[in-house]
Design a protein with these regions (language model features):
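Surface-exposed, charged secondary-structure patches
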Residues: 59-60, 64-126
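Non-catalytic cap/lid and distal C-terminal segments of serine-dependent acyl enzymes
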Residues: 20, 55, 83-87, 96, ...
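Short beta-strand edge/turn micro-motifs at domain boundaries
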Residues: 2, 132-162
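Short, low-complexity N-terminal intrinsically disordered segments enriched in polar/charged residues
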Residues: 1-53, 167
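Tryptophan-centered short beta-strand motifs
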Residues: 76, 127-129, 146-148
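Short beta-strand segments enriched in hydrophobic/aromatic residues
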Residues: 37, 54, 118-120, 152-155
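A short, polar/proline- and glycine-enriched secondary-structure boundary/capping micro-motif
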Residues: 71-74, 125-128, 157-165
């Protein structure tokens, strides 16, 4: 009989404890994810908060090989949380606000998949977004809190418009 190695359940994804309000529900963890990356030019992001949302070994996977480009040279980038922070931190020197505009959630037991359609702006007051796309979140609840296992996304482009069912 084959045995399966069980990994210990983490207290947090790093030494950074999550705010219980950020991880108490699917709505809360999705909102926290958008909140932590959004802010005005030059505002330092709370990367410890970001780290606390992710399960150890979680992946963040943009499909654009060059950060901030719309659907150019598509190639998944398999990043851990630290590599993601290093990739986006220079881009956040200008204002960046990402907001969810629609969501489809499917849940079975303690696992959930969330299709989260987003818009990105340089200023919260910008009339039109400079980018839109869809984030695919895979979540897990350990009985105490929700964790992000992965986020995978693609920006909208002329070749790949967001389908109506995701708006």
């Amino acid at each position: 009989m084959n045995s399966v190695e069980r990994l210990p359940m983490p207290e947090s994804s790093t030494s950074h404890s999550a705010d219980p309000r950020d991880v108490e529900s699917i709505d809360a963890i999705i909102a926290a994810t958008y909140d932590v990356i959004s802010g005005p030019a030059g505002q330092k992001r709370d990367w410890n908060r970001e780290r606390s949302l992710f399960y150890p070994g979680a992946r963040i996977m943009p499909t654009a090989s060059v950060p901030g480009r719309n659907d150019v040279d598509l190639e998944p980038q398999l990043l851990d949380v630290e590599a993601y922070i290093a990739r986006v931190e220079p881009l956040l020197q200008q204002g960046f606000y990402e907001t969810e505009i629609a969501r489809r959630t499917e849940q079975f037991g303690r696992i959930a998949h969330v299709w989260s359609t987003y818009e990105s702006r340089h200023e919260a007051s910008d009339a039109a977004p400079f980018m839109r796309g869809i984030n695919s979140f895979q979540l897990f609840n350990d009985g105490k809190r929700w964790w992000i296992l992965s986020i995978y996304w693609q920006h909208e482009s002329a070749d790949h418009e967001i389908p109506q069912k995701y708006l």
